[in-house]
UniProtKB/Swiss-Prot annotation:
This is Probable endoribonuclease MazF. PANTHER family: ENDORIBONUCLEASE MAZF (PTHR33988:SF2), ENDORIBONUCLEASE MAZF-RELATED (PTHR33988). Its EC number is 3.1.-.-. Keywords: Endonuclease, Hydrolase, Nuclease, Repressor, Toxin-antitoxin system, Transcription, Transcription regulation. It comes from Mycolicibacterium smegmatis (strain ATCC 700084 / mc(2)155) (Mycobacterium smegmatis). Disruption phenotype: The mazE-mazF operon is not essential. A triple TA mutant (missing vapB-vapC, mazE-mazF and phd-doc TA systems) survives antibiotic challenge, suggesting the TA systems are not required to generate drug-resistant cells. However the mutant is more sensitive to oxidative and heat stress, and does not survive long term starvation during aerobic growth on complex medium. There is a difference in the level of branched-chain amino acids, which may play a role in monitoring the nutritional supply and physiological state of the cell. Forms a complex with cognate antitoxin MazE.
Amino acid sequence: MRRGDIYTAAARGAYTGKPRPVLIIQDDRFDATASVTVVPFTTSDTDAPLLRIRIEPTPATGLSTVSSLMIDKVTTVPRSSLTHRVGRLAETDMVRTDRALLVFLGIAG
């Protein structure tokens, strides 16, 4: 389980109320924790470029349809709720995600 991996999260919490893919954004150095910080995906089409990062389905991501990362729904879930690895986000998409998170969280300045 590494930063940039896409897993299916079991149904838990307000934004993971149904099984859905999530992107692991937590640094790999914290792999001993019981929980992991993720950004959930949605297939709903919302025109909010700062809050939704559109990801095309590819064999590498394992996504079956165009999906968007919900930048405004960062959450922490138990590692045990991540059922299986779906794929991995491309480095270019990870950079886009990191930039959006910096802006959303107010870290970018």
